[in-house]
Amino acid sequence: MHRHILTILTGVLAALIWSGCSVSEWEQGFIPIEPVGSGNGAGQGGNTGDRTHNEDRRKVLLLYSAGYNSLRNYLLEDIEDLKSGWLPKDYPNHDILLVYTHTTQRNGAYGIPTTPYLIRLYEDGNGNAVADTLVTYEAGTHSATAEQFHNVLTYVRNNFPAGNYGMVFSSHATGYLPSGFYSKPESYEYIPKKSVMRQIGDGFDALPMTFETRPVPYHAPDFDPSLPMVKSADGTEEGTPMVRSVGQDQVGSAGEYVSYEMEIAEFADAIPMKFDYILFDACLMGGIEVAYELKDKCDRIGFSQTEVLAEGLDYKTMTEHLLKNTVPDPQAVCDDYFMQYIKQSGVYQSATISLIDCRELDQLAEVCRDIFTNHRSGLKAIRMSNVQQYFRSNYRYFYDLKSIIQEAGATAQELKSLDEALKRCVIYGAYTPKFMEEFRILTYSGFSMYLPRDLNTAFYFEELNSYYKTLDWNKATGLVK
């Protein structure tokens, strides 16, 4: 579906769009079958050889729903919405819709281990929605770890060969930030991690390495019960600020919580195949750092620069765009997301979203590298209050990429080159005029980015800068020296 430039007015507000459950609850809704593979998700007996003609035409969509946290009820509702929408016919001659789901037994029950499932949703010959359990994982499995994420994706790849893979990742998140940093930055210490996986030739098979997703202390932040729940929240109350990296399993009891979180490099390394698209139904993932880390793992990526209200994407219409159509249309999913929020009012009229062509990101990196090199002193002199923010409270780690470059003193020619590079890679972008009544959005490039800080601001930025230097975006552009 093609989108044109469109301005939507809602009263005096304007928005710009452009185009270039618990175990028992889930078992009640399933018709179980003999699992295709073992509970470790290794994909035993899967077809890893040459694909047939039908397999080349097949589309596979995976919803990875990591809800062993405060989003439990919202993520269960998302799956029910998915079941109520368009469903593919029975395997093996039709497209595949898979859901990996893991939630707490009940709200706040973070000390009770539960069982994750991989299920397949389809419509039978009588038009009934069927949910088949393919894999039952061991109770206590941590879903927000690179090891489990890799196990699930490997099972999907080995057992459902296809010409097109897509994924929706739904959980808590805080973009490029390292695990544990967001909730308590003064306690963060950068510790280098081993590379957990390497690409072999032109494939994406893993070498036998150890994944290093480590639990970090959980610190419950303050919350404002008057605000809506967001997909970066920590507690069981609405309006809670976020503390996540990519995904979250919150484990333990009050006063002794720990959190399992993936960092963006771990997330990327754990992916064993190439995706056509990845859509993040999670907060603050819309950064250039995230996109660049994933550019060799997917062709397109959809994400939000701001937090995501807990209702998230529109799951009722999602499969119509991603599976029913001959060619998947992730842009339509992004558009549906934005339209459901621009129609709201007050704090609920809050959303940003962009769809990125990852194949065009290298040109953007070249342009930005030259600008960063030419305006090193300008970057250091930026007044943060002059730059477009995408964060609430004092979590000052997410600013608009173009706004940073403008404030650094880029020339007219440099800005022209930047705009041309952005136009090539930002397929779609949309934003509401305000976000939760806390800040206006006046500049929007389709990417957030870190605004480098030094020890004169806070001592822990030395640790954050050390971590940031390991990201592929910084290696390509030299933003942080």
PLM region spans:
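Surface-exposed loop and adjacent secondary-structure segments within mature catalytic domains
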Residues: 101-136, 164, 168-251
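Functional beta-strand-loop-alpha-helix junction segments that form "active/interaction loops"
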Residues: 121-158
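Loop/turn elements at helix/coil->beta-strand transitions in domains of secreted/extracellular proteins
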Residues: 57-60, 90-97, 160-166, 272-277, ...
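Bacterial N-terminal signal peptides that target proteins for export
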Residues: 1-9
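Bacterial N-terminal signal peptides
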Residues: 8-17
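Terminal, contiguous helix-loop blocks that mediate binding/assembly
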Residues: 24-26, 42, 194-481
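Extracytoplasmic/secreted cell-surface and envelope-processing proteins
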Residues: 70-75, 106-110, 175-179, 285-290, ...
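Bacterial Sec-dependent N-terminal signal peptides
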Residues: 1-2, 16-55
